[in-house]
């Protein structure tokens, strides 16, 4: 992830294997740890084994980057993409 600075708003898209032991709890715990920057999330069942999560974020770029890195670091997470825009004038 490139350097993300300042106040940002954006979306994280994540694809993961919901059958991976302990992963759902881990991902929920991470999201609770970052509830100050997570505005909303949407969960979709893509197949029997794969899920898509869309997470809306707003906050300091370094916090958003840390959240993405934590989500990416777990076995069973197949893809994490981040798109942000500066909210500063």
Place the predicted regions along the sequence by residue.
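Long, contiguous binding/interaction regions
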Residues: 1-89
């Amino acid at each position: 992830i490139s350097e993300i600075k300042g106040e940002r708003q954006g979306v994280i898209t994540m694809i993961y294997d919901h059958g991976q032991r302990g992963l759902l709890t881990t991902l929920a715990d991470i999201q609770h740890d970052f509830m100050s920057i997570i505005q909303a999330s949407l969960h979709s069942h893509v197949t029997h084994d794969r899920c898509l999560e869309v997470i809306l974020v707003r906050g300091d770029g370094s916090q958003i980057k840390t959240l993405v890195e934590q989500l990416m670091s777990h076995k069973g997470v197949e893809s994490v993409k981040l798109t942000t825009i500066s909210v500063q004038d």
